[in-house]
Amino acid sequence: MSKKYCYLFTEGNANMRELLGGKGANLAEMTNIGLPVPQGFTITTEACTQYYEDGRQINDEIFAEIMEYVEKMEKITGKKFGDLHNPLLVSVRSGARASMPGMMDTILNLGLNEDVVNVIAEKSNNPRWAWDCYRRFIQMYSDVVMEVGKKYFEQLIDQMKEKKGVTLDVELTADDLKELAGQFKAEYKAKIGEEFPTDPKEQLMGAIKAVFRSWDNPRANVYRRDNDIPYSWGTAVNVQSMAFGNMGDDCGTGVAFTRNPATGEKKLMGEFLTNAQGEDVVAGVRTPMPIAEMAEKFPEAFKQFEDVCKILEDHYRDMQDMEFTVEHGKLYMLQTRNGKRTPAAALKIACDLVDEGMIDEKKAVAMIEPRSLDTLLHPQFDTEVLKKTPVIGKALPASPGAACGKIVFSAEDAKAWKERGEKVVLVRLETSPEDIEGMKASQGILTVRGGMTSHAAVVARGMGKCCVSGCGDIKMDEENKQFELAGKVYHEGDWLSIDGSTGNIYDGAVPTVDASIGGEFGRVMGWADKYRRLGVRTNADNPHDTAQAVKFGAEGIGLCRTEHMFFEADRIPAIREMICADTLEQREKALAKLEPMQQGDFEAMYIALEGRPMTVRFLDPPLHEFVPTEEADIELLAKDMGKSVAEIKNIIASLHEFNPMMGHRGCRLAVTFPEIAAMQTRAVIKAALNVNAAHPEWHIVPEIMIPLVGEVKELKYVKDVVVKTADEIISSVKSDMKYKVGTMIEIPRAALTADEIAKEADFFSFGTNDLTQMTFGFSRDDAGKFLGAYYDKKIYENDPFAKLDQVGVGKLVKMAATMGRESNPDIHLGICGEHGGDPASVEFCHKVGLDYVSCSPFRVPIARLAAAQAAIREET
């Protein structure tokens, strides 16, 4: 049997979203439950997919079926396309299975031409309405289908109003609108080079193709990438007979929500316009009245609408967003969908629906978008002020929150200005580990280069700092401490505001409001913890971030990057001394200075964790990241070391690597300098012993992680150093404290030989940042240069550094997990890359049976919710 590409509203239901899209499925469902819906049909998402497979053409089979359904629609309505006695007019709307802003706008009044206008003008005894419909249709069709900009038509309307001495569109007469329709058609011909189509079926096919085309427009592609909507889904098209809200004062149109979408309050909220068509409310051409006032104008229709709202909310068991029209006092429902809402409203609605007995806890957990929680945890801009503030630039929303401060161009200045009590925004070409102190001191970070997983983005997310990255429009002049953006030069000390949730950049200081986490947040998180199987830890390397993560529900630390501790101002001289040492004795002398500092850090972390586990990753980055680059710092180091500047410069030059990502780093440092691993082991073990002595009830078991292992013999060599050092210390104090030694799986070879490595490891932690780099063979710092082209050409749909590539990298993770468990059934498995806070990646980790995910502190609630949703989905 051949595939069916069209469905009448009477043939579908709410469960057919994949085929009919959200709008089509809900129109069918409203029809099924007996609500007043203008009838029509839906062209399926499969027809859209076929359109692209056929080289952006609607094939003969689909065309014939559309025409067949036009005839069915004509029979149902008793009206015909182009008929001069009873003409059929329709709206054409897009409708993907997930709501997608940026898709094609609606086309209303399709089916009109000069002959039909004259007929409906006479039949309705309302020529003004008829010509208003026609000029709207010409304008919409030209804009939406043929991409002739709205502005050309708006200019003609303004000229007509000026000529007639009126200020509002509604004051134009039938003759004015008829003249305007003629001008619109002339404008169409001038821009397109052909006459405006008069055949309703030609108009319909043009509109359907435009809907399909809009699935692949730049706005839609960006939205899909940001919201995990696959390109392969396609969009449906809804062809619906018109209900007219613009036939007179006993007509109108409106949009309403069954609950307040901003607060979640259980109260009907919406707007209504008399004598208007749908897009007038949305476009803000006229100021609508609150929905409550509709009761005075149309008491019967309003009473019916209130009943419909209750029916729909009870039916869908969620807050509904509805569009409706009143034609001569009669109500017609044009659309319903689960309404978009603020994160705070989402939590309140979920809890209220549970309390009202409408849904259970699992449904409440499942209905909240995990990533939306991000905005609840960070300061936000005052929305009222934001409406009046122009956007001067837009880049990648790398770490959420809002920040405003005075511009500084270096980490040193950021620190110095903060110490003076100033709020600053750090603006850099790109950030490096040396900038961490400056990033901490800043309200937010703005970079010219780098993507969502650049150094700035990753570190900012870990700190809970706002970050906007990759603003290539900035012309940077670091030397003179200034940059140019949107035609204006900004100097050090000028005020700037950035929004890490949208990527928007604003001139001046936009006031912020603190995030507030209500009681509903705690309730929903409690439910999430009840149903999830996957543990959630955090990536943290200081007590402040640790305490923050514990507050957000982290069950321990999955990644403590020890190198971040070395960048503190009081430690960097000692690490540089170690790097520049000529002998083992000199190195050990420098390491002896670092050891008590590291031990102190670990003790503070263990105290903040209150007995929760912590995985400490030994030194990972290449040594060149620690050496000075500024002349003054080089001279200072030479003086401290008793060496000449030339000698220090030679040492620095010798550390240069052509590909440091794959160079002398990770366990390779511990193999060449085992004394580093020994020092770090002493610091971890002594810290744990001290804290255990003070808090015996915590039973701390240190977890030591060796990074960048690719060969089991590497792990064995470094592990021997760790075990020898740890056992000596533990036995010297007659303790029976246990500890674990594990490794990161971040090199493909480690994943492929996981069975061998598991014999020497107590745990695996998948470092998916490096595993992604090495599997794809590109550096995450450089990938931004070409990934945009890959998205445009549909080679990749997502940034593999933000969303785990389940086909390639995921296969390695799954293989390593399976082989590791077969070889060592007691092995503990986790993931600690940035992917640990991405909901789709969390679901993958649940499916492959990992024990925990670890992510930055502010992503912990997201991971907890995503883990619960994965478990709930698996049950159903």
Question: Which ranges hold each PLM region?
Answer:
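Glycine-rich phosphate/ribose-binding loops and adjacent secondary-structure elements
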Residues: 330-332, 429-440, 444-446, 452-458, ...
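Structural motif
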Residues: 238, 408, 425-427, 446, ...
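Protease-associated
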Residues: 358-442, 504-510, 521, 525-529, ...
